[in-house]
Structure formats: structure tokens, C-alpha cells
């Protein structure tokens, strides 16, 4: 869990903080402050899912800086479209890494997508696919780097230490 969260923090385009949120929200992306805030003390899978959801918002829904290759800002998206995209990205990324968020994600997407027309939902599919792919690749690269750093640290810790005692010195009892 710690390595995965460290990888998420590294792929996030904005800083991530953990704190108590006074509203019902589990997290949020603040475009004006350029930061993500995640609710303290949630379970591991909820924390991961929320972090990925908010990173998706930071990549896709910052009006001044869309950060996904091949995605243009285009016309203004409704809040419901933004929520469907962010949660769908979170679900896809979490599923890839074996974290099942379907119970929460399906209800969340269904709630935000009700009343949407099929062409509007299809439009978001390419955005979801590209964003999830970019995040998965970034997370995998960061996890490899974290594991490489750990193995190098462990190798250094296991290097033999050679002590040389000079025979010319006298040691006095204390």
C-alpha cells in the first residue's frame, strides 16, 4: 500500500495532502490551489481509489492545463461528465492493479451518468481510456523505480564490513 501511494504521489501533477475534510467528500482536486486533498483514515482501497479519482480530475479537468496526451480541452464539460470520467479512470486503474472498487464505482458512475445520452458517454470513453493508460504506465514505472531503489539500499546494507585492528595499539581496560 505504501509503495502504491508513493507511486501515485509521484505521478500526480499536483501535490497530494491527507487531512480531515469537513464535508462528505472523500477527496477533492483544487484547481485554484493546484493540490489534491484526500480524507484521512479511510481504508486502503478507498484511499487508493479516491487518490486515482482526484488525480484523474487534475489531469483532465483543470481548465488551464489538460495533462493527458492526445486530449484537447474542447468545450466545457458538465460536472456529471467530469465525475463519470474521473471515477471510470479510477475504476479502470484500480482493476488493473487488482483492487476491486466495483461496488462503489458502479453506483457512483450510475448516479452521475443518469440522463446522459449515449453519444455523450461514448465521447468520454476515449478520454477515459487514454487517461487510464497514461496513469497505469506512470504507476508501473514508478513502482519499478521504488523497488529498484529498495533493492539497491538492501544490497548496500548487506555489503560486508571489514574491520582492521592495528596490532600496534594497546587497549586499556575501562
Question: Model-derived features: where do they sit?
Answer:
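An active-site-proximal "capping" alpha-helix that borders the catalytic cofactor pocket
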Residues: 81-96
Amino acid at each position: 500500500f505504501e509503495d502504491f501511494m508513493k507511486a501515485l504521489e509521484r505521478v500526480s501533477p499536483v501535490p497530494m495532502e491527507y487531512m480531515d475534510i469537513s464535508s462528505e467528500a472523500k477527496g477533492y482536486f483544487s484547481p485554484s490551489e493546484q493540490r489534491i486533498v484526500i480524507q484521512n483514515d479511510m481504508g486502503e482501497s478507498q484511499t487508493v481509489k479516491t487518490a486515482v479519482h482526484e488525480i484523474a480530475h487534475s489531469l483532465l479537468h483543470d481548465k488551464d492545463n489538460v495533462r493527458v496526451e492526445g486530449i484537447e480541452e474542447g468545450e466545457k464539460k458538465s460536472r456529471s461528465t467530469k465525475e463519470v470520467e474521473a471515477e471510470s479512470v479510477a475504476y479502470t486503474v484500480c482493476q488493473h492493479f487488482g483492487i476491486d472498487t466495483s461496488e462503489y464505482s458502479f453506483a457512483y458512475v450510475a448516479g452521475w451518468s443518469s440522463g446522459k445520452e449515449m453519444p455523450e458517454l461514448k465521447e468520454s470513453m476515449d478520454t477515459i481510456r487514454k487517461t487510464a493508460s497514461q496513469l497505469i504506465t506512470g504507476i508501473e514505472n514508478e513502482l519499478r523505480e521504488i523497488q529498484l531503489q529498495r533493492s539497491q539500499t538492501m544490497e548496500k546494507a548487506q555489503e560486508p564490513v571489514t574491520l582492521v585492528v592495528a596490532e600496534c595499539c594497546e587497549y586499556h581496560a575501562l
